[in-house]
């Protein structure tokens, strides 16, 4: 069965892709709604279901604008009011079908956003699909007026106004008419019905019948029996069936619909058909006659409106418009009425108040006064017509005012086709027979006598049980502690300590000879009141598979405990938190979730029908899971002993006044259901995380929509929506609108059939299937843990390889130690940033961290392409060595030289984000010689280098020049020895601290490869160089201020937007170094 709810879900996913555009569109609300010029945007879509041309709708809108302008002038308000028509060209969206209107609506929304043509309000769309998605995903902050949108999904939307009767109003009438038993022509209340659906209904009929079909709708919840008839074949079969379960059939259509069915009324004289045909003025015309096939039909329609007081709209001019076009016209008049009201009061028409003001009001429409209820839906008076057997005409039977939900009979002596001119009973074969009345009276007398006798016997039995003290019959010596091997249980959970602590607090014990839980009743003397004794006595006989067994009470030391059945898998809350043992993909699938909800509903249904009557503290921690994966309810029946608490599961009426009720348990079930479905924290909502604030907002609602958890309907599939709607019904603000657990149980049983094909499966089969699922999951979990261990081992290896050289890590893994080693010849590279202190002076600490991180990440990438080892970074210094820990002959000098050239080439292209235009200068020093290396320390071990070679390389860097590679003569000698084609120039004699004066060189490139090296600064004097660099920084800061470049936010540690952030990317800085 295809449901329109599926369309809503599919299109909501599509709409997520357009959120940026819609957000922009949402920001244009005040574009054409101020300074004396006010526009209404009219969204016109090709919907053939209404059989109305766009030109006719434009004519109706323009007619409404003329009236609005006239009324504003009469009120001395001289402003400009216009309409902007938005519609597609019909080239792409050709179907004109309501189900495909969402795509067309999205295109029109983008057109509005692109052209910035949004006015004060939006008129349209008319289809429930597009209206629901626009309201759901765009967070409308302006009034939206719709001529249509009949479906239940558009009910109670804060800024949506509907100008045609929605399905909700129809259901109110049907329920009131079904329950009426004191009308002159109806002596029985009805509780059954068939609903006919042939799949060819008009737009409004489609949504009316769909609402009656929904299992969670008001109509379905109230009726004891309801069945859908799909197609003429099923209808004819039911009409001819003498054992049918109802005489009443609801359908939507026209007299032509009835004629096409070709019903044989001679075989169905007790049948009553309610034909919903609201938008058809044919029945009340003077020359209208009722065909013979309408004699068993009651027609529900809307009477023609009263003549308008506006001389600009005559009856003749209104006849050219259909009800759909008149709804557009009335929408324009409503906009004009609200505009006049706000302008008179000097209020802002773009404010939040204007968007929520289109409700609870009456204005002058095209055919008379129009009233809107507190949800923004139109109220009107429906009329129920019948066919007179005398005149063969349609006559009014009753009026129904949707504003006050009141039925007013018009014809007290109708000339019906039915027997005695009264409507028949809804169940075939029932009626006011004298014999039946006599039997019922006699049975009532007998029942009354038996009831009196039962009450006397019950009172005697109760007093006798209280005297025997059955509620505290367990001697303390029968409560035994658990043995050691029983207390220690194997678990696959990694962090199981918390769970074991929770179990210990519950005081596990052994009783006859089962495991049990001791429930602290918080009484020290054991002197219960008579009410409390009665309450405890009711718990003993309760024995149901979805309830934990209560064994009695016991006094240990000075405290009283209840002895309750133990369930091995803990509470439902713990199971939901355990995502490893109970993953979503296998065990905790939708079928299992529905089964869990059914277990709870089954247990609560039994509990409510038992002597216990009410739970009072139903929550996910009071639902436990046994070894067979059956959910049981516990902690019930102590309402007079344990005072009620204000919890997230507590119903709002009980938060305001501490008490308990069955409807309050239904609310608690709704909160538990949301926990199970979402598998999140209790009462999960994105708008609030504080528990006390949640409880306060539930207890004190601040608007029409009460505060409830999030359900994320837009991501739900078709079958899941039935569950979501049931949950929403369970946490209704009005307790009377919540279903009882019997209805919840039946609804879940039907929903379970949608998820599970084996509908005739026994309870034992279901139980075995659950255990098989759990067993397969354990096997999968063991395999997954093995893979997880291997992945963690490999990740630890990768981390070690980032901290230490690979040979060093291998030695540590194999031997546990790393022997220090002396290397005859290695090449060490040092570099640091010129003017780093000056840059820090003009930068924030976070900007300095960002600068070093961006620079050294790029250095690390260059290092990966050469046979070198990064030793460490010390502040702005970067240290690299080659030739260790793996010796590479004379290649160490070649690799360091090539790496230095690559780094210097990169520096020429690097630019600081917070100081645009400022060049980054580095000094590079390289030296070759012997060196010792080894791992130092146990905690945060370091692979350190020792020797004069390291110090000399550092001196080469500190005495070098900006943007130059300063090399010692030993490195140049190695390069000459291997005959590599490196280009270098002699710098001359350079003084090195601790070594004296030596001849040094500058590496400038290679003969067979071009490097784009930056041009070094020409200033030789150090002081002039520093002054020039300071001027550059000052100019860069002025440039940043002039162009409005903002620095990075200092709230974070560093920016990693140029690369993937992984915990393997480490950056450590030591205060002291072993090299100096």
Swiss-Prot record:
Extracellular side: 24-433
Transmembrane region(s): 434-457
Location of the Protein kinase domain: 492-752
Domain of life: Eukaryota
Membrane topology qualifier: Single-pass type I membrane protein
Glycosylation sites: 35, 82, 191, 198, 287, 306, 310, 348, 405
Cited InterPro entries: A/G_cyclase, A/G_cyclase_CS, ANF_lig-bd_rcpt, Cyclic_nucleotide_synthase, Kinase-like_dom_sf, Nucleotide_cyclase, Peripla_BP_I, Prot_kinase_dom
Subcellular localization: Cell membrane; Endoplasmic reticulum membrane
PTM summary: Glycosylation at Asn-62 is required for interaction with VIP36 while glycosylation at Asn-348 and Asn-405 modulates ligand-mediated GC-C activation.
GO biological process: intracellular signal transduction; receptor guanylyl cyclase signaling pathway
GO cellular component, one term: endoplasmic reticulum membrane
UniProt keywords, alphabetically: Cell membrane, cGMP biosynthesis, Endoplasmic reticulum, Glycoprotein, GTP-binding, Lyase, Membrane, Nucleotide-binding, Receptor, Signal, Transmembrane, Transmembrane helix
Protein's UniProt keywords contain Cytoplasm: no
Residue span, Guanylate cyclase domain: 827-957
Catalytic reactions on record: GTP = 3',5'-cyclic GMP + diphosphate
Xref: SMART domains: CYCc (SM00044)
Broad enzyme group: lyase
Subunit comment: Homotrimer. Interacts via its C-terminal region with NHERF4. Interacts with the lectin chaperone VIP36.
Task performed by this protein: Guanylyl cyclase that catalyzes synthesis of cyclic GMP (cGMP) from GTP.
Family: Belongs to the adenylyl cyclase class-4/guanylyl cyclase family.
Protein name as catalogued: Guanylyl cyclase C
Organism: Cavia porcellus (Guinea pig)
């Amino acid at each position: 069965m295809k449901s329109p709810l599926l369309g809503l879900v599919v299109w909501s996913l599509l709409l997520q892709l357009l959120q940026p555009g819609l957000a922009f569109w949402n920001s244009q609300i005040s574009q054409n709604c101020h300074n004396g010029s006010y526009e209404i945007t009219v969204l016109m879509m090709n919907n053939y279901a209404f059989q109305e041309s766009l030109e006719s709708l434009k004519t109706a809108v323009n007619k409404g604008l003329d009236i609005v302008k006239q009324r504003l002038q009469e009120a001395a308000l001289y402003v400009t009011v216009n309409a902007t028509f938005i519609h597609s060209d019909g080239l792409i969206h050709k179907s004109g079908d309501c189900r495909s209107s969402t795509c067309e609506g999205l295109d029109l929304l983008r057109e509005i956003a692109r052209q910035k043509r949004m006015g004060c309000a939006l008129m349209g769309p008319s289809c429930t699909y597009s209206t629901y998605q626009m309201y759901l995903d765009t967070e409308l902050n302006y009034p939206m007026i719709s001529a249509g949108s009949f479906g239940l999904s558009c009910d109670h939307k804060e800024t949506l106004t509907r100008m045609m009767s929605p399905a909700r109003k129809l259901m109110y009438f049907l329920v009131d008419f079904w329950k009426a038993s004191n009308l002159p022509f109806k002596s029985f209340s009805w509780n059954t019905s068939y609903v006919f659906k042939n799949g060819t209904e008009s737009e409004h009929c489609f949504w009316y019948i769909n609402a009656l079909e929904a299992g969670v709708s008001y109509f379905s919840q109230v009726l004891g029996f309801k069945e859908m008839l799909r197609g003429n074949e099923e209808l004819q079969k039911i009409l001819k069936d003498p054992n049918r379960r109802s005489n009443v059939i609801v359908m939507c259509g026209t007299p032509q619909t009835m004629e096409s069915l070709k019903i044989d009324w001679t075989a169905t004289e007790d049948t009553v058909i309610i034909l919903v045909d609201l938008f058809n003025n044919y029945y009340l015309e003077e020359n209208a006659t009722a065909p013979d096939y309408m004699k068993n039909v009651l027609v529900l329609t809307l009477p023609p409106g009263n003549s308008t007081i506006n001389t600009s709209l005559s009856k003749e001019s209104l006849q050219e418009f259909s009800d759909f076009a008149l709804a557009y016209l009335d929408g324009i008049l409503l906009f004009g009425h609200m505009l006049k009201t706000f302008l008179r009061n000097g209020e802002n028409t773009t404010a939040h108040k204007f968007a929520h003001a289109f409700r609870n009001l009456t204005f002058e429409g095209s055919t008379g006064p129009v009233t809107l209820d507190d949800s923004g839906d139109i109220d009107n008076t429906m009329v129920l017509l019948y066919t007179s057997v005398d005149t063969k005409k349609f006559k009014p039977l009753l009026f129904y005012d949707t504003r006050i939900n009141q039925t007013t009979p018009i014809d007290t002596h109708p000339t019906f086709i039915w027997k005695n001119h009264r409507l028949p009973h809804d169940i075939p074969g029932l009626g006011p027979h004298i014999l039946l009345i006599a039997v019922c009276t006699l049975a009532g007398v007998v029942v009354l006598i038996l009831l009196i006798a039962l009450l006397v016997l019950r009172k005697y039995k109760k007093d006798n049980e209280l005297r025997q003290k059955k509620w505290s019959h367990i001697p303390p010596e029968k409560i035994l502690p658990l043995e050691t091997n029983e207390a220690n249980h194997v678990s696959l959970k990694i962090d199981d300590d918390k769970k074991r602590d929770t179990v210990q607090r519950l005081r596990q014990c052994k009783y006859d000879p089962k495991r049990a839980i001791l429930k602290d009743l918080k009484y020290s003397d054991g002197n219960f009141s008579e009410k409390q004794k009665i309450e405890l006595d009711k718990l003993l006989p309760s024995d149901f598979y979805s309830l934990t067994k209560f064994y009695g009470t016991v006094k240990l030391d000075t405290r009283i405990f209840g002895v309750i059945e133990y369930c091995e898998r803990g509470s439902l809350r713990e199971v939901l938190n355990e995502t490893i043992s109970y993953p979503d993909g296998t065990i905790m699938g939708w079928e299992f979730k529905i089964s869990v909800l059914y277990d709870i509903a089954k247990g609560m249904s039994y509990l409510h029908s038992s002597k216990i009557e009410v739970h009072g503290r139903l929550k996910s921690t009071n639902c436990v899971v046994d070894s067979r994966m059956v959910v049981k309810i516990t902690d019930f029946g102590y309402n007079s002993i344990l005072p009620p608490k204000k919890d997230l599961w507590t119903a709002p009426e009980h938060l305001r006044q501490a008490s308990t009720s069955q409807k309050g348990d239904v609310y608690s079930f709704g909160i538990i259901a949301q926990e199970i479905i979402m598998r999140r924290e209790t009462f999960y909502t994105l708008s609030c995380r504080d528990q006390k604030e949640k409880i306060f907002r539930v207890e004190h609602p601040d608007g029409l929509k009460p505060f409830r958890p999030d359900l994320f309907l837009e991501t739900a599939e078709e079958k899941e929506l039935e569950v979501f709607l049931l949950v929403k019904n369970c946490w209704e603000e009005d307790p009377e609108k919540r279903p009882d657990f019997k209805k919840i149980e039946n609804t879940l049983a039907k929903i379970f059939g949608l998820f599970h094909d084996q509908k005739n499966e026994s309870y034992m089969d279901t139980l075995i299937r659950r255990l098989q699922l759990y067993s397969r999951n354990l096997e999968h979990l063991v395999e997954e843990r093995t893979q997880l261990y291997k992945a963690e081992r490999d990740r630890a290896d990768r981390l070690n390889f980032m901290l230490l050289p690979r040979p060093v890590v291998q030695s540590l893994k194999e031997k546990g130690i790393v022997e220090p080693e002396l290397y005859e010849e290695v090449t060490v590279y040092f570099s640091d940033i010129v003017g780093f202190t000056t840059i820090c002076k003009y930068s924030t600490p976070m900007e300095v961290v960002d600068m070093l991180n961006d620079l050294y990440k790029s250095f690390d990438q260059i290092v990966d392409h050469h046979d070198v080892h990064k030793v460490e970074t010390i502040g702005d210094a970067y240290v690299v060595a080659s030739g260790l820990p793996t010796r590479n002959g004379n290649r160490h000098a070649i690799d360091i030289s090539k790496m230095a050239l690559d780094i210097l080439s990169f520096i020429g292209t690097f630019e600081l984000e917070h100081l645009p235009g400022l060049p980054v200068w580095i000094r590079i020093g390289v030296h070759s010689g012997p060196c010792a290396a080894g791992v130092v320390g146990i905690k945060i071990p370091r692979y350190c280098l020792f020797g004069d070679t390291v110090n000399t390389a550092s001196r080469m860097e500190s005495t070098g020049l900006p943007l130059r590679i300063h090399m010692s003569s030993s490195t140049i000698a190695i390069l000459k020895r291997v005959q590599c084609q490196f280009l270098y120039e002699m710098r001359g004699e350079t003084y090195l601290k601790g070594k004296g004066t030596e001849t040094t060189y500058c590496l400038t490139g290679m003969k067979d490869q071009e490097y784009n090296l930056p041009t070094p600064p020409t200033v030789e004097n150090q002081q002039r160089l520093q002054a020039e660099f300071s001027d550059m920084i000052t100019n860069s800061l002025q440039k940043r201020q002039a162009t409005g470049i903002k620095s990075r936010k200092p709230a974070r540690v560093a920016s990693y937007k140029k690369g993937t952030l992984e915990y393997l990317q480490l950056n450590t800085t030591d205060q002291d170094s072993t090299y100096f």
